[in-house]
Design a protein with these regions (language model features):
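Short, charged/polar micro-motifs that form catalytic or ligand-binding hotspots
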Residues: 78, 94, 122-125
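Short amphipathic alpha-helical surface patches that mediate protein-protein
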Residues: 105-109, 122, 133
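DNA major-groove recognition helices of helix-turn-helix
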Residues: 88, 124, 128-146
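Amphipathic, well-packed alpha-helical segments that form the structural scaffold of globular domains
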Residues: 89, 93-97, 118
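Short amphipathic alpha helix immediately N-terminal
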Residues: 94-113
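N-terminal interaction/assembly modules
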Residues: 1-91, 144-166
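Helix-turn-helix DNA-binding module
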Residues: 110-127
Length: 166
């Protein structure tokens, strides 16, 4: 993904102290990089979509017919909700280290609050929330820059939901 102000300003947090809501911040040599609030917003939009897909998972999902462009013009069938759930889970598992993965599983997947997570993992509140922010930044960047199809996780499935949240 090409990171510039026009891509990041729509999902940046207005009250961010680093970017002031612009979505980009200056680092060494005057280079602009996306702010961490943008990555956290991307993760939260993906996570909200994940929760919606899981909540609707008890019902039979619809099968989508997709056209594959090319010589033969084939068609494929897919289940978008199940694919999104699988992509979200597998990408998260692949990107996080053991400690972050444990917190991710307890807090995001199982829904434990911060008090229960801190008690179970024997960590203090500050360490827990710093790790949560680090997880959101790391996975937000990963979901936005996912190759070969970053649009699979972010653009078509999450961006409309992100605009509705913001």
């Amino acid at each position: 993904m090409q990171w510039n102000r026009s891509n990041t300003i729509g999902i940046a947090k207005n009250s961010c102290t680093y970017c002031s809501g612009n979505g980009t911040r200056l680092v060494r040599n005057g280079k602009e990089v996306p702010c961490n609030c943008v990555f956290r917003a991307i993760f939260r939009a993906c996570y909200n979509r994940f929760r919606d897909c899981v909540a609707k998972g008890t019902h039979t999902s619809t099968v989508t017919l997709e056209l594959c462009y090319g010589r033969e013009g084939r068609r494929t069938y897919s289940r978008k909700r199940e694919e999104f759930i699988a992509d979200f889970s597998l990408v998260s598992r692949r990107e996080l280290d053991e400690f972050e993965s444990k917190i991710f599983r307890f807090h995001f997947l199982l829904g434990a609050d911060w008090k229960l997570c801190c008690r179970q993992m024997r960590i203090d509140r500050g360490t827990f929330f710093h790790t949560i922010y680090r997880i959101e930044q790391k996975l937000g960047r990963t979901f936005a820059e996912l190759r070969p199809y970053p649009s699979l996780m972010f653009r078509f499935r999450v961006l409309p939901a992100a605009k509705a949240i913001l």
